[in-house]
Amino acid sequence: MTRIKNNGISKKKRKRKISKMKGWVGGHSKLFRTGNQQLMKARHYAFYDRKKKKNLNKTLWITRINGGLKYYLTINEKYNIFVSFLRKTKTYVNKKLLSEINVRDSKSFSHLSKPIMKSTGINL
């Protein structure tokens, strides 16, 4: 059987991975096998949490819009009813923009919301 010499390539690969493990506790930063397992786990969580962050932001935006409806319009309308009114009046504004308007400029949020609610028959 022939001898395969790729020691230099393997060392480079290990060095590259170990350099990404700096600052970790215990053998995770020194030993290749345990560190590699932690690196794979860290990459998995990084991917998963990038997806999770989007969902958390959406829930934050919906909560802000719902709070703005209750505070500025003094009605107990829910977010989903408000969104259905937006669709009926063909006002296309995304969740992020609505929540930013609510946080930064509350008067314009109420000016945006009142005509929509009046056009659907809700008295304010």
From Swiss-Prot:
GO molecular-function terms, A-Z: rRNA binding; structural constituent of ribosome
Gene3D superfamilies assigned to the protein according to its UniProt record, in alphabetical order: 6.10.160.10, Ribosomal protein L20
Keyword Lipid metabolism belongs to the record: no
Similarity comment: family membership: Belongs to the bacterial ribosomal protein bL20 family.
NCBIfam families: rplT_bact
Purpose of the protein: Binds directly to 23S ribosomal RNA and is necessary for the in vitro assembly process of the 50S ribosomal subunit. It is not involved in the protein synthesizing functions of that subunit.
Full protein name: Large ribosomal subunit protein bL20c
